């Protein structure tokens, strides 16, 4: 899989923190997020899923993720936004790759990306969270084009 190393700025994000199997929690989290964004007339910059754990090491019921939108730096949480978190994705060096997800198979591109990056002789993966941004509306299109971000540092 082709990827590039880029310096990313921090992102201010707002949305929902979820715990459990990602195939359920990400979908549930985005349903909640869409209702909140529509109901509060939030203007998102990007739609993002943030992943905190390695699914090969953490039991599915303990996997953590955030389903969020990136927002302007001066964003203020609207009243009656129970359960919504406002936090940041750290800036820094990230390996980035674009993939098309079909049949709801988000895992395969991530595994391919990690496999390619683990062979990199100049960069190593760090322990900060990974995330993906959505480049289209997969519900309407029947597939998702995503950009994946894995935090790295020079070896």
UniProtKB/Swiss-Prot annotation:
Major location category of this protein: cytoplasm
GO CC aspect terms: cytoplasm
Where does the UniProt annotation locate this protein? Cytoplasm
Pfam families named in the record: GyrI-like
Give the InterPro entries listed for this entry.
AraC_E-bd, DNA_gyrase_inhibitor, DNA_gyrase_inhibitor_GyrI, GyrI-like, Reg_factor_effector_dom_sf
Q: Does the keyword Nucleus apply?
A: no
What are the alphabetically sorted keywords of the record?
A: Cytoplasm, Stress response
Name one molecular function that GO assigns to this entry.
DNA topoisomerase type II (double strand cut, ATP-hydrolyzing) inhibitor activity
Coiled-coil annotated residue ranges, if any:
none
What family is this? Answer: Belongs to the DNA gyrase inhibitor family.
Q: Which HAMAP family match?
A: DNA_gyrase_inhibitor
Q: How does this polypeptide assemble, per the annotation?
A: Interacts with DNA gyrase.
What is its biological role? Inhibits the supercoiling activity of DNA gyrase. Acts by inhibiting DNA gyrase at an early step, prior to (or at the step of) binding of DNA by the gyrase. It protects cells against toxins that target DNA gyrase, by inhibiting activity of these toxins and reducing the formation of lethal double-strand breaks in the cell.
Q: What is this protein called?
A: DNA gyrase inhibitor
The upper taxonomy is: Bacteria, Pseudomonadati, Pseudomonadota, Gammaproteobacteria, Enterobacterales
Q: Which gene encodes it?
A: sbmC
């Amino acid at each position: 899989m082709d990827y590039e190393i880029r310096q990313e700025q921090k992102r201010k994000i707002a949305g929902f923190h979820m715990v459990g199997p990602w195939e359920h929690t990400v979908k549930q989290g985005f349903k909640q997020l869409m209702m909140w964004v529509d109901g509060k007339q939030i203007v998102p910059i990007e739609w993002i899923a943030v992943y905190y754990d390695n699914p090969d090491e953490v039991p599915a019921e303990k996997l953590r993720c955030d389903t969020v939108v990136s927002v302007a730096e001066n964003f203020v949480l609207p009243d009656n936004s129970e359960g919504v978190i406002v936090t940041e994705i750290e800036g820094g060096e990230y390996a980035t790759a674009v993939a098309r997800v079909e049949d709801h198979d988000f895992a395969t591109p991530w595994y391919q990306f990690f496999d390619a990056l683990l062979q990199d002789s100049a960069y190593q993966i760090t322990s900060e969270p990974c995330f993906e941004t959505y480049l289209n509306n997969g519900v309407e299109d029947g597939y998702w084009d995503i950009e994946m971000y894995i935090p790295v540092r020079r070896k």
